[in-house]
């Protein structure tokens, strides 16, 4: 289940000044679409690796998985995911939680992308 909670968070911009900036799970999802799985050549959202996004003020928690427990690019993908979320104006803290249930299968790939891939 995905959170669409809107919260007020301090802005990290404007040279230390703070301003209320509403954060949305959709903004987090958009930022995560910039993270590409190097082995698959697709972003982690369209791959279906992002399971849940929770926004609470300036804190963001993302539950995600990898294509396999032995994914050699796992540390890179997790690090890039955290950096992408932390780059959003208003995010103070990002936590990326790696989960293995439900286990990822190619059925989780976005239907539009699956169609383009011929799956």
Model-derived features with residue positions:
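Domain-level signature for proteins that mediate thiol-based redox and metal-cofactor handling
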Residues: 1-119
């Amino acid at each position: 289940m995905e959170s669409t909670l809107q919260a007020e968070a301090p802005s990290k911009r404007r040279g230390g000044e703070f301003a209320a900036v509403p954060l949305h799970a959709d903004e987090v999802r958009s930022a995560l679409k910039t993270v590409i799985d190097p082995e698959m050549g697709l972003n982690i959202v369209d791959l279906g690796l992002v399971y849940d996004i929770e926004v609470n003020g300036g804190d963001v928690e993302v539950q995600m998985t990898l294509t396999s427990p032995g994914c050699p690019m796992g540390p890179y993908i997790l690090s890039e995911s955290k950096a992408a979320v932390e780059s959003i104006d208003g995010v103070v803290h990002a936590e990326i939680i790696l989960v293995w249930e439900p286990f990822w299968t190619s059925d989780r790939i976005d239907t539009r992308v699956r169609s383009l891939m011929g799956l």
